Amino acid sequence: NLNPDDINIYRQLSGGVTSSHILHGSANTIGGQTQLIKLRWGANDQDLKFAGADPFIKFALGENVKRSSSTQGNPRFPDSRMGVDQVLMDAFQRATDYQNSLKAAGTKGTVRKDLELDALSEIMNKKRFITCHSYVQSEINAMMKVGDKYGFTVNTFTHILEGYKVADKMKAHGANVSTFSDWWNYKMEVVDAIPYNAYIMQKVGLNVAINSDDAEMARRLNQEAAKIVKYGGLTEEEVWKMVTINPAKMMHVDKQTGSIKVGKDADLVLWSDNPLSIYAKAEKTIVDGIIYFDREKDAAMRKLNQAEKARIIAKLTAAKR
């Protein structure tokens, strides 16, 4: 479930974020549902959800899947990239057989309902969309081959730090890509990462976004995008799209948000400077036309909190005497 009390919702508003795609971890090849939310601080869990957004599902490839249980002394399949590929092939074949059985049964209802296979069937019928944790070119190619065989497109490859090696193939497949700006060498499968990755994928013609994967970095995505101006020389407008309209397109909500246009949701940020500057601060963050973060009011609340804290401490100190 979503936690509407998570302080990171407010902190990300303070960094100029209006929407966020919430995903679970990457221990399983085929994971669970994801959730697109708007950062409506103070709302309950249901009201955080982005109304009308398409359903997505988290997939994962590579080291995280391979090592998720073996490090705990409980090895399990899959324990290799080939095993991960086989998990995918087996799952979608079962889903294909399941759909065929449902069609054959017609209205008789003789096929036992399977929620896992229902989700995979939604993917093949373009009713649910994949966000896939990925790094290495071999596994990216393998994932696309599974999609081609079973008639679906991987909507988004996330992290995708070897994306520059297979950008042309991902474009032909129809995928979007969401990557880090300059992360490198934090595990073995990232050793070939380069800071020009986003630039190269953009030039090939992919729809590129910058992702955070971290609550702290999520409120600094403006600075992460700015790095791509240095690494590749894209224009400021091109890199700004990587944290605005491009991710909105990936999530199929670009008709509602991601740019300033008559008829779209009033999701806006007032910056103190060029938002790509390291000196820029979000002065006001507006979601659906409502101001959810105001820097002046935030400063005033902090003063009140400090004064109240001092009063309570003084009272406790006096009581001890």
Q: Residues of each region from the PLM?
A:
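Intein/HINT protein-splicing elements and their conserved insertion hotspots or analogous self-processing inserts
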Residues: 84, 296-321
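Polyanionic/metal-chelating signatures
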Residues: 5-154, 281, 287, 316-320
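Short acidic loop-to-helix transition motifs that present clustered carboxylates
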Residues: 137-139, 160-165, 245-248
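His/Asp/Glu-enriched, well-ordered alpha-helical/loop segment
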Residues: 129, 168-171, 175-271, 291
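Short, charged, surface-exposed secondary-structure boundary motifs
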Residues: 32, 47-49, 165-168, 186-194, ...
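Soluble non-cytosolic domains of exported or imported proteins
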Residues: 2-6, 78-82, 137, 192, ...
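C-terminal cap of metal-dependent C-N hydrolases
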Residues: 261-305
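Catalytic beta/alpha-barrel core
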Residues: 131-135, 153-162, 182-187
